[in-house]
Amino acid sequence: MKKLAKKLLLLFISIQFVACEGSLEPHLYGVVDTGNAFNTPADLSAATVALYYELRQKGWGPYLFCDGSSFVMDEVSTEEWTTKWSWVAFLNGSWTDADQMVKGFYNWTAPNITRCTYTIAKMEESPVTQSVKDLYIAEVRALRAFFMFDLYRLYGPMPMILEADQAINPDPDYKPYRPTSEEVGTFLTTELRAAADALPVEQAEYGRITKGAALHYLLKYYMHEKQWQNALETANEIIGLNYYELEKDYASIFSAQNEGNKELMFVVRAEPLADYGNHTYANILPGDYASPYGNIVEGWSGHRMPWEFYDTFDENDRRRALAQAEYTSKSGATVDLRASGDVGALPLKYGIDPEATGTWAGNDKVLDRYAEVLLFKAEALNELNGPNQGSVDLINDIRKRAFGFGTSLPAIPVFKESFDGEFVDNVIGIFSMNNYDQAGGSAWKYDVDKNNTLNNGNSLHVEVESSGTEFWTLQMRTEPLVAKGRKYSCLLYTSDAADE
């Protein structure tokens, strides 16, 4: 089962000139045009594969690990990732619209919307059997929705070519309007729902979009929009497919030797070959890093996991071992990155592909996996119901893999207290704090500035003396009586007395 990208057609133009009385007639062989491109199932498959190629683009595409990719765009806004390269404006959030780093994903991906629209229109005109057309059209509709959702979450609603006539016969003077968020949402949910209904749970060729992959993007949209009930129902639909499962070993999820495992829902496939692989480790490794497998690997010493984030991992968390704080150099020396002043650990979640040579690794880039479905469901349940055993059970499914054990929610909380305060302008706010302490011995107190009235001009102070065996849930919310047309915000700060 080789990579989809390898199936791309290479078009060679052979021109034969034949001498005739008074004229020369050119004959073009092997040229794909609108008259012969979508006439067979193989044509439809090739057209679909060409769109999958846009995910990777010779290993430097929008869904891999390169500059401006969705990976970098997502991680730069967190405290989980940094780079040693001179991306000062990008890392500090002070970029402008002239910065290629922040608009690279858009420039790569936005044209794919038009390509998908064109392909769908041509497939609909194809003489191929309807059932065959429906399957390929569903894949392309899903891909178009994938592209559009990721553009939407990174850039907001953007003008897109969704009209077949404009995709087939583009008008240089045509200017598509900027849709509203609601219009984007209607388009995404309609397209993903239709695609999911038409796609199989498992494709004959690994790497193609499945029912579960389409549903997962639908779930991501609902989570992004905080549509908790829709998210819960979609998560349950994915779970109900009875197809996906968690890998027992976290590291094996991303291993090049464990492709196609049942935790993976959608990936960008790769081979350890130039243009067909991923430079997963090349962005990370120092130049003198020695592969534990003896193969020659290159490193550009850029991506890092900041020490502040690395130190949040419990020493018993098995995932911590995938971020290397020290390594063996090609000279055989042990290099301590923290001691040497490096900005962070090596985030080698994807590991080193033992078959890799130079830059290119064969690890598939994981875009969606089943663990996210379980955590999304846990979050949706908590948003709908508050702290509940169902959410804890789902989280424990993940924790047990990392720690070998989970945590529990007592049947009867030993402590429950709430504080109701009247906001100004008839806005009601409710503060509640729940302590689940299985060992006892903890205490807490709170006070509110300005005569104990919680409003938009003061603060709530909570002090907790911890027994070390409990966990807390804190909720801050506004009731339906909030004034319409106004914006509210709540900032929560926590600190440990030992840090003060």
Q: Which ranges hold each PLM region?
A:
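Short, surface-exposed recognition loops and adjoining beta-strand edges that mediate ligand/DNA contacts
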Residues: 35, 62-81, 158-164, 200-286, ...
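Conserved, well-structured interaction surfaces
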Residues: 45, 53-54, 59, 82-155, ...
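Secreted extracellular polysaccharide-interacting domains
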Residues: 463-484
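Extracellular carbohydrate-recognition regions
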Residues: 410-440
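Short carbohydrate-recognition loop motifs
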Residues: 446-468
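Elongated scaffold/linker segments in the mid-to-C-terminal portions of large proteins
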Residues: 42-43, 48, 56-61, 77, ...
